[in-house]
Each structure stands twice: as C-alpha cells, then as structure tokens.
Amino acid sequence: MDIYKGTGAFSGIAIGKILYYHKSEYQMRQYEITDVKTELNIFRQARTRVMEQLEDLYEKNCIIQGTQAEIFLRQKNLLEGKSFQRAIESVIQSEKVNSAYAVMTTRDEMLKTFRNLEEPAIKERLDNMREISDRLIGELGGISPRIDLGDEPVIVVTESITPTELMEMDKDKLMAIVTHHGSDMSHAAIMAKTMNIPALLEIDTDSEWDGRQAIVDGYTGTLYIDPDEEVKKEYEIRRQADKEEREELLKLRREPDITKDGRKIEIYANIGNMDDLNSVLYYGAAGIGLLRSEFQYLGRENYPRENELFLAYKKIAETMGEKLTVIRTADLGADKQAEYLNIPDETNPIMGNRGIRLCLDRKRMFKAQLRAIFRASAYGNLALMYPMISSEEEMDEIEEIIREVKIGLDEKGIPYKHIKTGIMIETPAAVMISRELARRVDFLSLGTNDLSQYTLAMDRQNPLLRKKYNDHHPAVLRMIQMVIEAGHAENRRVCICGELAADTALTEEFLRMGVDCLSVVPACILPVRKALRQVDLSGDDKGA
C-alpha cells in the first residue's frame, strides 16, 4: 500500500479503480490543398458547429454548475472573435494547407508566444484557446472530444484538469478527481464542490497507477494506492457514515435558520442563472442573496435588449414570490469578457475596468439593466446591489442615473416598486469607508472572494500562492468585523457571501460578529444551516 498526501479541494470519500487520463493536444498531418475557397468553407462550417456545441454544453451544465458553466460561453466568445478566425484563414490562404493543420499551427504559435506569462487571466485565456483549438481540430478530423470513462465508476487521476474536461465526463461514472496541478480556489475545484465529487490536488500523479485500486480521502487530502483490507474496511464504514450524514442534512430542507437560542440568521442562495432557481427552492433558502446577472451578457454577439432582461427578472421575481431576490448589476470585465464589449486588453484585468467601473463607462448598457430591474420589481420582491464600489463619487453617479431611470419610467406610466439597494464590499477601500457607504444604501454585502485576494494582495487562483493564500487571515476577518460594525452603526443589514460564507468552520465566528445573513451556493445551504443551528449566542450582545 502506498500513501500520498495532497490537498483536499472537496471533502468526501471514494473507493474504486483508477483511470489515468492522458492529456494530449491533437496533432494533424499537413497536406497541400488546391481549392482554398472550399477549404475556407470547411473551416467556417466546423467553426459554426463547435460554437453550437459550446452553447449546448453551457445549457446542459448550467443547471448544476451555475456560473462555472460560463467557461463554455467564454470559449464561444473566443471562437467568435475575428482575430483568431483571421489568423487561421490567413494560414490556409498563404500556405495552402488543410484547415486542421492551420488550426494546429495557429494554436501552437499562440501558446509559444505567451507561454512564459504568469498572469492568471492570460493563462486561463490560453487554456481556453487550447481547448477550442482542439475542438476545432477534432471536428475537422472526426474525433470526439468526449472523455470516455468506461463502463464502471472510476477515480480519475491526471496532471491537471480544466472545467470543460470535468463537465464533459459522465457524472455517473466519476467517483473522484486527483490532480497534480491546481488550487482549491480554481474553477475546476469549485466545480467539484458543486458536483459533490471528492477532489485531491498537489499529488505527484503517476500514469502507472492506471487500473489500480485506490481510496481518496478528501477530508485529509490523502490518496491510498492498493490499500490493504484493513484500511479498505475502515473507509467503507466511513463512506457509509458520509452517506447517512448527507441523508440527515436533507431533513433540514424545511427547518428554520435559527440558532440554538432562537436567533434568526437567514441563509440565502448565490446563483448565476435562472436554472439555479429550482435548487434555491429545493434547499429552502430564505431567498436569493446574490443573483450574478452576467449570464445574460456572455455567449452572445451583442448587448441584450432591455425587454429580454426584463422578462428574465420578471420570471425570477414571480418564481420567488415574497422571498427576496438581490440582483447584482453586471460585473463584467476581468474574466467575464464578450467580443461585443470591446474591452481593451489590460495588464491586470482583475484590478482593471470591471464591475461598476465598466457600467459607469457604458451608461446606456447600465440604464437598460436598471430599467429592466425596476420594471420587474412590480412582480415580486427585488433588490439592487452594485459590485466593486470603492468611492462615494461612484455612488453619486449611480444615484443620478437611478433618478434619470425613475423619471423615464414615470413619464411612460410604467409601474415599479421601491427597490432596496445595497453595495458589495469587496475592496479594502470600501471597507475603510463602509460607514459612509452604508448611509447611501439599505444594506451591505461582503464579497469575500475578492475582498480576501485584494486584502492579501494575492491572486486566489494562482497555484504558486496556494499554500500562502489564507482567507482566514486575521486581516480578512478584521475587515469583515469592521464592515459589520459600520453597517450596524447606521442600522443597516450586513450579509456575507462568497466562499467564506459557506465555510462552516467560520459560521459561529461570523454569528458572534453579528452578521445578519449568509449567502452561499445552493449545495452549501444545508451544511451551513446545520452549523448555524448548533450555535448558542446566549449572552452575546453582538448576536442580539
């Protein structure tokens, strides 16, 4: 029996046979063509088919994966981009070679040009470029991109895995994931959580493990190769206990969000598209604490029309009924790009023109979304929330735009309700002026994912920093405490969302800080509810 220690990206236990997944880029034979026009048509038709495949993959996966499935839309956007298309067609025309070979050489040239850049956003873009190139080559060469896991459930071991590879695996055959590269905050790791699949990272994987028996312990980050009978028996018992615990959690679906001493601390859901609505209701969330509205802007060739936005928000409002739905205005930019937005390349897009900054630059887009939200407010209980606020001057601009939107609706006799507004506190600047910001809105919501990385000055998806990245850092927790105190000083509700809100190791600490609500992905509602119901805040003034 061999034992390997890594990092558990998602807890759980898997026992079974290993399938080692070999990643290889498609290599195509070069041959000369005589009819350039026909070859260009072959390429363009394949490009159209791949874009349709990516759209289908998004629609099939968004119900379970939510915002993680948006990677298919980002890949579709890259494929729609004229620069990539022109580069490939230029090779076909100038070198008179087959289209599959032209795609391969264009891919290789791009990867060679940017291979030494460590900027995570660029690396993700290159990964997407590699994947869509391989899809194109596969389509042109008649090769299926689907990863065959065989007939029986397996533990997939590989050097690294991308979200698209993970989503294309048969979920019924996938028991666990073990990789050498990656971080517990990567898109693939977060996706494993939503799929309830145990995942281990930073394991020195070996292709010779293929076909051997293994145990994955996501709790301790341990991998056992060829486990002995005693260890296997122990883990069979633990796996059964895991199953029973999940069944117990399901009994909490209709239980109230109250502490042992009767304090009500509501648990809301974070969702990234309309298909997540079913899981919000299934797990008994108090409402939607964060609706990421970017899904309406990605994977398309132009801005969504106001009426399209309105109909989506109206459906959400009607579905949720009296339950609150907080719509965050479009947080575009950074890793959420679309060709039609024409956002210039930035050295550091995470720190660049994104969120409210981009909305204030694109006022026509911003007003269309605001009008749609106000119109939909007549059909339910909606609230507005602004992302990436860092100054009162931004709030001045927003308030003027809101005033103009309301005047326009009034002039046309379009009904709307009073909408509560809130701010995402996700920058240190916003933390330091959180009391001033609280006076401008009805509630505050702590976006802990961005707040943590900006506070620590570390990219949370950079694998080189994984061991140093600590979102439990005292500085992060003190900032959260500061915002809660600032909000309460102005009689404003303060909610925590993001990965930290779902961390049950912090649930009691957040409650003792005085947080009013938590907002988590639907799959985490029940574990957080269980943790919350075990806390006793008796005698704690902040919990009152």
Indicate residue ranges for each PLM-predicted region.
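Conserved, well-structured core domains of diverse proteins
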Residues: 1-141
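Acidic, glycine-rich flexible loop/linker segments
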Residues: 2-28, 141, 148-153, 157-282
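Conserved alpha/beta-domain cores
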Residues: 246-544
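An amphipathic alpha-helix/helix-turn recognition signal
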Residues: 45, 105, 184-187, 275, ...
